[in-house]
């Protein structure tokens, strides 16, 4: 039986149609899978921020239920960030060497387990230990998430959306921890345990998304996968001591004059400096192959010098931005609750616009980053945060909320909303493929240090003014101390804006072209979009 040409043409058309349908379905599945990957990484950011803000909310109730003295209460809040900050660099290196999915899944599972374990704590010692162990999960999740986003989203538009969504997870998590966590603490029978149940659920959801959506890790392009254990000890111990001093300096017996505080600060800084010199030595020996016994550096110092040193500037801008953002939030809360005397829920309502606009700034950034020069975004974000600090630095307690408090809450998150996402997009473009998670680790370390450093420095300034405080009237030194703290916050934001203006002068739109990085030198080859004209 013969086949006519007409039947053959029909068969060809049918096959072509089927192939087209299969390709369309595959493309749709790819889009859905990529969206779920982005959601999983954003969830990691949400879990991180929710955990930080929720702990601050539950501290008063926790202290009452577990009979924790106020002098030891600070350890509950600082134990987690202390451990997280110490192990971010280590996990960044592990992610780049051995893949990102496994650390992401491990971190999510670890976070869920030890967050749930916190609800069984019976005293401050067990709470401190569990909080520290919980911080290890966060240290694994965050660098892995940055590397996963860089691996998954290759096109400029997709990467832009992915990192702005990742950045938006921070204000969303802060809102969940503060608003929902505060409501759960006050309205549920489980009180302080309820926010930890919420975080456990979010961690499990992150784990499920990670297992399902994230692709298996591709093999590392680095042949030598040895870990620099000396460098790991130097940076982990150094950061541990520095963050410890920043969190405990104000509560020590003689505050910053306490001998062990001074000694630990000196030793911590010395170890961090020694780490950088050791990494530089290893990088030189390893690159020239003059010492086969040398392992690859834990973190290449040349990473900081990419794009003519602008990578280092970006890291320091992130540090200063977080100094400003979190010290503003800290002192705004204390102003409302301690100075004005508002209940916690009313304080949350007054700060609610900050959480909303924190998300909106990331949405706005998605539309602007491919059109507006990079330097303008970095400068304007921190400038708006500086204006928010200025409003609280000159605030009149008798004025209505809409005169000072509301515009400050609207403007304050601009620094974090613009600078964080811009920094991540910029740094992942100038870093090599096998350095993506390390970039995320360094950025997260800077945010951890910035949070502690900003609050610590502004507290020192606050304390220098507050001893003369006599009452809470408008022109009293008590008000002056809160204003002085916000002037310090303004200085951080202004320094960040100034550094961005100097470092990125002439830099064009980040996402107009694709950045190409020379693997030998690490310098930009096509740098019109990143390093200026």
Language-model segments: residues:
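Cytosolic juxtamembrane N-terminal segment immediately preceding the first transmembrane helix
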Residues: 1-50, 64
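Transmembrane-helix exit segments and adjacent C-terminal regions of multi-pass membrane proteins
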Residues: 2-4, 25-28, 32, 36-37, ...
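Extracytoplasmic
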Residues: 33-78, 86-87, 141-142, 146, ...
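Transmembrane core module of solute transporters
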Residues: 39-41, 50, 55-58, 71, ...
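Central cavity-lining transmembrane alpha-helices of secondary-active solute carriers
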Residues: 78-93, 138, 142-146, 352-365
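Helix-to-loop junctions at the C-terminal end of transmembrane segments
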Residues: 87-100, 185, 359-376
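Helix-loop-helix hairpins in multi-pass membrane proteins, especially solute transporters
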Residues: 94-230
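Hydrophobic transmembrane-helix bundles of small-molecule transporters
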Residues: 187-312, 316
């Amino acid at each position: 039986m013969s086949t006519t040409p007409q039947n053959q043409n029909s068969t060809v058309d049918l096959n072509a149609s089927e192939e087209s349908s299969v390709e369309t379905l595959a493309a749709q599945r790819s889009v859905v899978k990529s969206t779920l990957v982005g959601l999983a990484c954003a969830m990691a950011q949400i879990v991180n921020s929710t955990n930080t803000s929720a702990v601050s909310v539950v501290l008063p109730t926790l202290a009452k239920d577990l009979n924790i003295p106020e002098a030891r209460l600070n350890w509950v809040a600082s134990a987690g960030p202390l451990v997280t900050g110490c192990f971010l660099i280590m996990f960044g290196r592990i992610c780049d060497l051995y893949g990102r999915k496994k650390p992401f899944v491990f971190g999510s599972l670890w976070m869920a387990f030890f967050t749930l374990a916190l609800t069984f704590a019976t005293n401050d010692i067990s709470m401190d230990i569990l909080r520290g162990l919980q911080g290890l999960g966060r240290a694994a999740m965050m660098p892995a998430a940055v590397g996963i986003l860089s691996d998954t989203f290759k096109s400029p538009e997709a990467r832009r959306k992915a990192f702005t969504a990742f950045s938006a997870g921070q204000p969303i998590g802060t809102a969940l921890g503060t608003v929902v966590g505060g409501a759960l603490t006050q309205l549920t029978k489980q009180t302080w345990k309820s926010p930890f149940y919420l975080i456990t659920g979010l961690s499990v959801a992150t784990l499920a998304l990670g297992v399902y959506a994230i692709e298996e890790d591709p093999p590392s392009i680095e042949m030598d996968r040895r870990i620099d254990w000396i460098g790991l000890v130097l940076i982990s111990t150094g950061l541990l001591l520095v963050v410890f001093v920043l969190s405990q300096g104000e509560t020590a017996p003689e505050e910053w004059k306490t001998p062990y505080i001074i000694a630990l600060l000196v030793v911590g800084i010395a170890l961090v400096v020694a780490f950088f010199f050791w990494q530089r030595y290893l990088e030189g020996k390893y690159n020239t192959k003059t010492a086969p016994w040398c392992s690859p550096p834990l973190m290449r110092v040349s990473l900081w010098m990419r794009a003519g040193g602008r990578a280092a500037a970006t890291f320091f801008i992130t540090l200063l931005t977080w100094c400003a953002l979190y010290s503003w939030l800290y002192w705004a809360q204390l102003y409302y609750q301690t100075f004005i005397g508002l209940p916690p829920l009313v304080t949350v309502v007054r700060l609610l616009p900050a959480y909303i606009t924190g998300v909106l700034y990331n949405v706005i950034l998605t539309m602007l980053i491919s059109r507006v020069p990079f330097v303008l975004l970095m400068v304007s974000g921190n400038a708006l945060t500086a204006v928010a600090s200025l409003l609280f630095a000159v605030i009149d307690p008798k004025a209505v909320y809409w005169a000072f408090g509301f515009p400050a809450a609207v403007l304050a998150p601009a620094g974090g909303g613009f600078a964080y996402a811009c920094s991540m997009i910029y740094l992942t473009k100038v870093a090599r493929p096998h350095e993506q998670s390390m970039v995320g680790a360094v950025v997260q370390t800077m945010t951890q240090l910035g949070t502690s450093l900003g609050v610590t420095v502004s507290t020192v300034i606050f304390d220098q003014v507050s001893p003369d405080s006599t009452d809470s009237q408008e022109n009293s030194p008590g008000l002056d101390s809160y204003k002085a703290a916000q002037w310090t916050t303004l200085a951080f934001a202004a320094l960040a804006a100034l550094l961005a203006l100097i470092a990125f002068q002439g830099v064009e739109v980040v996402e107009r072209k694709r950045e190409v990085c020379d693997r030998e030198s690490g310098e930009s080859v096509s740098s019109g979009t990143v390093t200026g004209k």
